[in-house]
């Protein structure tokens, strides 16, 4: 899972073109398309999102269509961009304030969009609540392969500290599961 050459461990994309490889090796760049969104859709059993992925839809355009209530073909670039920000922001616990600071939306518009998002993908809200409750009861969460992330501050009386742990309760299993999948793929490529 790592290079045997220290300097190549953190190879930047722009530097790959300047690396010479012998005939027995290749440099490979691979990416799982929207892996974190696919993972949260699966873990949450969010059927609307799963169906969009299974139908080969662009998830950001599909989300924009749902939250703005317009046909996919009429989605503007700005609306798709806002939906993309919401899609990824949900994983990181974005608030109306956070969304408004990342987009041209007002805080009120951001709240309306986040509410519409959860109406479009109701399984996600349920999943998020279950993750936080599980962490509060057990003090940890797990990735799909059982790696644990302990959250010692999940029951903190300090709302700021507790809020950070609650966001970790949602995103750590998703990011950790993505890492699990990618590392397994790296091992399998090497076989």
Task: List each language-model region with its residue ranges.
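Single conserved hydrophobic/aromatic residue that forms the stacking wall/gate
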Residues: 1-13
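Conserved catalytic core of nucleic-acid polymerases
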Residues: 65-191
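A short acidic-Thr-Gly-centered motif at the start of a beta-strand
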Residues: 14-26, 191
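Short hydrophobic beta-strand that contains or immediately precedes a catalytic carboxylate
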Residues: 27-31
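Short, polar/flexible loop-turn hinges at active-site or ligand-entry regions and domain interfaces
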Residues: 47-53, 71-75
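Short active-site loop/helix that positions an aromatic residue
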Residues: 33-45
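Short secondary-structure boundary/capping segments
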Residues: 7-10, 43-47
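Hydrophobic (often cysteine-bearing) scaffold residues that line and stabilize catalytic clefts
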Residues: 5, 36, 56, 60, ...
């Amino acid at each position: 899972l790592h290079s045997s050459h220290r300097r190549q461990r953190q190879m930047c994309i722009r530097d790959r073109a300047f690396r010479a490889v012998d005939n027995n090796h290749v440099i490979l760049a691979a990416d799982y398309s929207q892996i974190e969104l696919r993972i949260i859709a699966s873990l949450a059993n969010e059927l609307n999102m799963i169906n969009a992925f299974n139908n080969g839809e662009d998830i950001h355009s599909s989300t924009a269509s749902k939250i703005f209530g317009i046909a996919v073909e009429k989605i503007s670039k700005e609306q798709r961009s806002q939906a993309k920000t919401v899609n990824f922001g949900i994983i990181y616990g974005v608030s109306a304030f956070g969304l408004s600071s990342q987009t041209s939306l007002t805080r009120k518009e951001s709240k309306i969009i986040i509410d519409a998002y959860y109406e479009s993908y109701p399984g996600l809200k349920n999943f998020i609540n279950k993750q936080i409750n599980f962490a509060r009861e057990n003090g940890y969460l797990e990735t799909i392969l059982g790696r644990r992330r302990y959250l010692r501050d999940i029951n903190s009386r300090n709302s700021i500290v507790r809020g950070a742990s609650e966001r970790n309760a949602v995103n750590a299993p998703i990011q950790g599961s993505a890492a699990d999948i990618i590392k397994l793929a790296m091992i399998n490529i090497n076989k």
